[in-house]
UniProtKB/Swiss-Prot annotation:
Disulfide bonds: none annotated. It comes from Mycolicibacterium gilvum (strain PYR-GCK). CDD domains: Ribosomal_L10. Belongs to the universal ribosomal protein uL10 family. The gene is rplJ. It holds the Pfam family Ribosomal_L10. Forms part of the ribosomal stalk, playing a central role in the interaction of the ribosome with GTP-bound translation factors. Keywords: Ribonucleoprotein, Ribosomal protein, RNA-binding, rRNA-binding. GO terms for biological process: translation. It comes from the Bacteria. Part of the ribosomal stalk of the 50S ribosomal subunit. The N-terminus interacts with L11 and the large rRNA to form the base of the stalk. The C-terminus forms an elongated spine to which L12 dimers bind in a sequential fashion forming a multimeric L10(L12)X complex. This is Large ribosomal subunit protein uL10. InterPro entries: Ribosomal_uL10 (IPR001790), Ribosomal_uL10-like_sf (IPR043141), Ribosomal_uL10_bac (IPR022973), Ribosomal_uL10_bac_type (IPR047865), Ribosomal_uL10_CS_bac (IPR002363). GO terms for molecular function: large ribosomal subunit rRNA binding; structural constituent of ribosome. GO terms for cellular component: large ribosomal subunit.
Length: 179
């Protein structure tokens, strides 16, 4: 690879690091081209799965201000650059690694810090943002209904008490007029 090509590759990878909300570093030893194509399809359009030379990736990470990943760039390494929601991509990688033992998740990077394998797996085990938001909205709606019931309850109790007093008074007046 010519020096100019390497510089371009480093700049491209550094740009991907900067644009990504998260990255997951994997080892793909033993995967076929068709396996890699299947993995890329399963990751969706918000994730770019890139195979690059470790030395170039290390330089690009340093250029992008990413620290703590150098020890992951050993052996055949590929990186999933995730733009947007990291949960779906982490789920897809975890499922693919479960089905294809040749794919090994080495770690990742998110929110300015390196992630261990277990942290990447925990992200994969989270529910998607949409599911969490809908659960939150449901909880808020339930609390609003409970609050509304609390506000309405005293007024209805007062109304029932007034009706009972009125009934009792009417019954008392009827008894006096009958006597």
């Amino acid at each position: 690879m010519a020096k100019a090509d390497k510089a371009t590759a480093v700049a491209d990878i550094a740009e991907k690091f900067k644009e990504s909300t998260a990255t997951v570093v994997t080892e793909y030893r033993g995967l076929t081209v068709s396996n890699l194509a299947e993995l890329r399809r399963s990751l969706g359009s918000s994730t770019t799965y890139t195979v690059a030379k470790n030395t170039l990736v290390k330089r690009a990470a340093a250029e992008a201000g990413i620290e703590g990943l150098d020890e992951l760039f050993v052996g055949p390494t590929a990186i999933a650059f995730i733009e947007g929601e990291p949960v779906d991509a982490a789920k897809a990688l975890k499922k693919f690694a479960k089905d294809n033992k040749a794919l090994v998740v080495k770690g990742g990077y998110m929110d300015g810090r390196a992630l261990s394998v277990s942290e990447v797996e925990r992200i994969a085990d989270l529910e998607s943002r949409e599911v969490l938001l809908s659960k939150f909205a449901g909880a808020l709606k339930a609390k609003q209904s409970q609050a509304a019931a609390l506000f309405v309850a005293p007024a209805s109790q007062v109304a029932r008490l007034a009706a009972a007093l009125q009934e009792k008074k009417s019954a008392g007046d009827s008894a006096e007029s009958a006597a």
